[in-house]
Amino acid sequence: LEGELAIGGRTASALVEEAGGTPLFVYSRALLDKRVADLRAALPERIGVNYAVKANPLPAVVVHMEPLVDGFDIASAGELAILQDAGIDPARISFAGPGKREEELEAAIAAGVTLNCESAGEAARSLAIGERLGQRPRIAIRVNPSFELKGSGMKMGGGAKQFGVDADKVPALARDVIGQGAEWRGL
């Protein structure tokens, strides 16, 4: 507006004045709505859209995103606490990432969050914690595909990596997890 940066129809200088100075963060709810709507329009209906809380864990943003997305992806107990404080249904939360600490697994299992297990060891730890808590852990397995992603700049497939279980080991691990009583959530 008038040659100045505008966010949500308001000039940056007006927002700075209202906030009482800088630095400040400004988010446009209308733009968040539009971006999610654009993404949904570009995808087949059967594809769900999850919000990665690590992208922006600000509680006001999380609360705004709640009706727009199908679920939430977290990578820490701190992010789980933000979603719990916002009243997000734990059935809509999945916890991914390597190196989950014991207390993080315990908090997630107690809350009823889906764990995306990165290894057989993490699955075993989750099952043991679930048994100790008297709760069936909700488990999915993160698959490390046996092919290399070409041209994407990503290096997450094609052999042993820190993210996920190698594809050839997934069937046995899935049978084991299901056989030990976990609530199977998928791949």
Outline where the language-model segments fall.
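A charged N-terminal "starter" segment
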Residues: 1-131, 135-137, 160, 179, ...
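Glycine-rich, aromatic-flanked loop segments that form ligand/cofactor-binding clefts
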Residues: 134-148
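Active-site loop/helix belt of alpha/beta enzymes
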Residues: 129, 145-187
